[in-house]
Amino acid sequence: RTPAFSATGNLPAMGKPSALIVWGGWDGHEPDKVAELFRAILAEEGFEVEVSNTLDSFADKDKCKAQSLLVPIYTMSEISGPQFEGIYEAVKDHGVGLAGCHGGMCDSFRTHTEWQFMTGSQWVAHPGNDGIRYWVNIVRNNPHPITAGLPDFEVVSEQYYLHVDPGVNVLATTPFPTPGVDGPHVQNPCQMPTIYTKRFGAANVFYNALGHHADVLEAGVPRELMRRGFLWAAKGVGL
């Protein structure tokens, strides 16, 4: 139902879906540029999109629970109790979808374990730092509309080493160790989850570990994965 590199999604014949993008935190991840990219993807799919640069938007419970999709882009920083409760309750209790990428979703609020419980992983290392050439491999024995028809692909960027919830549904992985990249992890070869989905309460959750800079996600398969992930996660939309 979702061909590779489709220009449009499969939105239902009902009112427009809505998305709230909240960006901020560490500037090195270009959160403003990533927010604009995600806004454009969602707008092309017919979403009404609000973009905010304050976590106080999450504290508005009525706003959050009225959305189809919530997209955090907020590396590190801290989140207050009311801010967390707004997004947490919208996702867990009201089925509002949650989707994001890289440190903007899974290196946010590092001391907040409930955030990690909701999102499904936490960044812990990127051996070799930026500029590493590595492969992202679709998990072929786990067919899913997000990855249907898409090829494995090569990336030059940070390669995220995550601590991952064992309950997530892994759609793509990257191999560790990467040739030429040394570190204390090299004696523990593994296939690290790069793209996954999960359920959390009433909601769908989608995560893509790519996205150190906006250009990593701007074209080709990475962009298509974000597009499909947004649609799959969004309440009342789907693929």
Predicted feature locations:
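A glycine-rich, often tryptophan-bearing local segment used as a flexible ligand/cofactor-contacting loop or short
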Residues: 77-149
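Short, solvent-exposed loop/turn segments at secondary-structure junctions
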Residues: 26-27, 77, 105-107, 175-178, ...
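Extracytoplasmic/secreted proteins, especially bacterial periplasmic and envelope-associated proteins
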Residues: 33, 37, 86, 145, ...
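Extracellular ligand-binding/catalytic regions of CAZymes and related secreted enzymes
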Residues: 7-18, 40, 44, 179-193, ...
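Catalytic beta-strand/loop cores that center a nucleophilic Ser/Cys/Thr
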Residues: 43, 65, 129-201
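Conserved beta-strand segments of alpha/beta enzyme cores
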Residues: 48-50, 169, 204
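Structural detector of well-ordered beta-strand residues that form the stable sheet scaffold
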Residues: 97-99, 171, 206
